[in-house]
Amino acid sequence: MSKVRVHNVTISLDGFAAGANQRLDAPFGDGVGWGDELHSWFVAATEDVAAGKTGIDADHLARGDRNIGATIMGRNMFGPQRGPWADESWKGWWGDNPPYHHDVFVHTHHPRPTLEMAGGTTFHFTDEPLETVLGRAVDAADGQDVRIGGGAAVIQQYLRAGLIDELHLVIAPMLIGRGERLLDNLGDGIDGYRVSEMVTSPAVTHVALVRR
Amino acid sequence: MSKVRVHNVTISLDGFAAGANQRLDAPFGDGVGWGDELHSWFVAATEDVAAGKTGIDADHLARGDRNIGATIMGRNMFGPQRGPWADESWKGWWGDNPPYHHDVFVHTHHPRPTLEMAGGTTFHFTDEPLETVLGRAVDAADGQDVRIGGGAAVIQQYLRAGLIDELHLVIAPMLIGRGERLLDNLGDGIDGYRVSEMVTSPAVTHVALVRR
């Protein structure tokens, strides 16, 4: 049976996955440079994986792509626009050949036509309920697992609903002060989870949550 | 010159130092057993220190008592009562011989007479401003450092005011979901701090914040 997994979601020491006021010229929100600092471990680990190196960060990063057949994300992760689409020229942050290579379901109150990209990535835009979208993603994954890509609000919704099987998050050694907290507004959903791993590399701390 | 230090403050993975509704029969607030779970590393490390053992947790724990000449705490850390003192029979959580053995300054809107305990601990109750209380504590420390003992609200106030030199906190691998967040409401105070250490033992992750 397909698992629902979250991987490589980076938060600051004070718990923020993104700052306030995300927008096109500041995809992680207000503040200079901290979006880069927050994800610097990710960039370094990506280079390590590409070079065939192993290590705590590279191993955790690579795990996130293994056996994933479909991805679900929030509209804010797909793009910086809010409200109705002014036009449909925006095709995501990732260029013509996005690094998914499978079906990606984008939760949005403003659906638009399905978008087929090079390399096998197809973006589906939907305002259906979580369970319906997850069902479609499981079908699309065809026996592989489904990844919830983010952002924080979407992960919270799936966690609160108890729909996530494994959540890997990464604590970066920095303070942001304000923005969007990942582990917040979880209600009783969190009672079903326990920490199964906590390990620190020279750069960050990796934490895994799994069902009790 | 005296430093102002915070040590061994334990927070959950989701950032809480205490739950909601702290009271006499639930000093860490609502919820069964998690106060014990949050601090289980502390109990084990205390036993290790007493037995002369070393290790990541024991070493961090012991550091918190080194070269400390005075302690500052909030009234909620001194006791579970709120509002005016019904009587003054409460003498803290720690019995007749508290583990401080120096002057302890308790921030409270409801001052009461100074309380001399066995073993050299003297509790002073004050509604003076942070800077005044810190000045008194520095004098009392007589060349040694001053420790801010807690709870979360008092640590936040000193951090926001930029008055803390070193902050050692401990992340326990558990979720609490609601309560009092330590790294919250810090305003621009946090801009003066950086993470100087992050290390994980088999039990917890230790993090140190210092001035930039």
Show where each model-derived region lies.
Chain A
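Enzymes that bind and transform nitrogen-containing heteroaromatic metabolites
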Residues: M1-R212
